[in-house]
Amino acid sequence: MLLDDRKLKILQAIIDDYIYSAEPVGSRTIAKKHELGLSSATIRNEMADLEEMGLLEQPYTSAGRIPSDRGYRLYVDQLMKIDELNECEIEKIRSDMNIRINELSQLIRSASAVMAKITKYTSMAVSPHMKKSVLKSVQVVPIESGKALVIIVTDANIVRNNLIRIPESVTPAFLIQISNMLNEQLKGFTLEMLKSDILNEKFEKLTALPFRLIKPILDGIEELIITIDNPEVYLEGATNILNFPEFKEVDKAKEFLNILDEKKLVSDLLTNSVNDNNEIIIHIGNENAMEGIKDCSLVTASYSVGNHVIGTIGIIGPTRMEYSRVVSSMNYIRNKINQEILKLLDNG
């Protein structure tokens, strides 16, 4: 959509003012606050044109104008200036994310918390998708007679464990022997390669030990791999939405909070909102497919191991969002996550 310079400046002034005030913006306000060199009457005529073009709306007669979803889209794509984070905000992010972290899920949880704190919106994050992760080590640790703990560690230092039942005749020495064999044979495999038929075939051929003693351990590994492939969802600041006048109606706020309670919905929302170009993605209002968030904007970014996207972080709030602030915060935090992932890998 092509707009002349005058219309663009007026649209930007209206959106900037509305984001700050949450009140419809009138032509006199624009004429007084912004040095556009235009009369109130001229601005009013331009606002009428912008409304006709679908970029502004008038919530009620005699009110000023507010941006439509299309207006916000044009603002984000063409007019928004990305603010740099100030030193205080940067230090806050660094201090919150520089705590001793030795596991990737812990890092993502920490990042989600700091995003909500910095932006004052609701933050969401999905823990890493681990199909492509490489197995670094396997341990089978005796717990008590008839029980053992299978522990696997990936190349991204993600640790998972599973309590399994084993024959009571199995000794700790046998479990050490099995652990050594598992590491020798499985280290370096990606998790998606470790299916039950591969595991069974590999160990039936490789060992003279009774397969009935090994089978519960292999089953335990497969169960762990299945759970790893069901990523966790982290939410912070869910009730922040109640601080915005757009959500003062109880039913509207309730619908939003109910969606956040559905972890599968949130996971799908984030997973479906990324691309392969490592860009920050912004979905505004009706651009969101989910009915309960059509009055919201969703901003998402992916984080990576090397060139592989393994997870997503996001911010959700009203369409009257401080987009510049959110984008700058998310970009910094996403880069920080990627840096910390490299540290975890180097230390692993």
From Swiss-Prot:
One of the record's GO molecular function terms: DNA binding
GO biological process, one term: negative regulation of DNA-templated transcription
Keyword Protease: no
InterPro entries, A to Z: GAF-like_dom_sf, HrcA, HrcA_C, WH-like_DNA-bd_sf, WH_DNA-bd_sf, WHTH_HrcA_DNA-bd, WHTH_transcript_rep_HrcA_IDD
Domain of life: Bacteria
Keywords (A to Z) from UniProt: Repressor, Stress response, Transcription, Transcription regulation
Keyword Aminoacyl-tRNA synthetase assigned: no
Pfam families, per the entry: HrcA, HrcA_DNA-bdg
UniProt xrefs under SUPFAM superfamilies: GAF domain-like, Winged helix' DNA-binding domain
NCBIfam families: hrcA (TIGR00331)
Free-text function comment from the UniProt entry: Negative regulator of class I heat shock genes (grpE-dnaK-dnaJ and groELS operons). Prevents heat-shock induction of these operons.
The family this protein is said to belong to: Belongs to the HrcA family.
Protein name: Heat-inducible transcription repressor HrcA
Gene for this chain: hrcA
